[in-house]
Amino acid sequence: MNIILMGLPGAGKGTQASEIVKKFPIPHISTGDMFRKAIKEETELGKEAKSYMDRGELVPDEVTVGIVKERISEDDAKKGFLLDGFPRTIEQAEALNNIMSELDRNIDAVINIEVPEEELMNRLTGRRICESCGTTYHLVFNPPKVEGICDIDGGKLYQREDDNPETVANRLSVNIKQSKPILDFYDQKGVLKNIDGSKDISDVTKDVIDILDHL
């Protein structure tokens, strides 16, 4: 079972990824984890990726794609994987398609967690962090007992700069633009499964598991 998990920031991908790997014996493979593993193990591609990152440059697609191929070819991923954070561009989607053909495997489902933009704005702009202990709160989902004050140590709560409405709106806009051609690509292949991510977490999980159970 080879799955790609997609969704905009704030859609709850991390939560659903945890639930999927609890139910199915496949590794959750995120782009960040892949890079860290390749760099730590000092593979040729890992060294190459590190040299770009050390210079503050974007890692080129051919290096990223190579690292993905290495990772999904490992023993623990031979019976399937949950890919999160890749592909990010249509070129990467096409490259992944080629890799899967070379490995004589298929992408079985692309799970896309859909949440209305307004709801994502509420989720992402509501985060508050204690400036002394780092505890995270949410104004709607996990508010402090006293507004603006940490329950644990009485520290002042602040909003991260990248959680302000303007920054969040820009981030969502960029992500929507980037993800549309990828979603269209997988829709044409008949593997795109859209999930309503605005439901309760347990209901979203049930919908995801139902789809995967029927693959």
UniProtKB/Swiss-Prot annotation:
Keywords in alphabetical order: ATP-binding, Cytoplasm, Kinase, Metal-binding, Nucleotide biosynthesis, Nucleotide-binding, Transferase, Zinc
EC primary class: transferase
Top-level taxon: Bacteria
Chain segments carrying region LID: 126-163
Region annotation (NMP) ranges: 30-59
Catalysis: reaction(s): AMP + ATP = 2 ADP
Record-given protein name: Adenylate kinase
Encoding gene, per UniProt annotation: adk
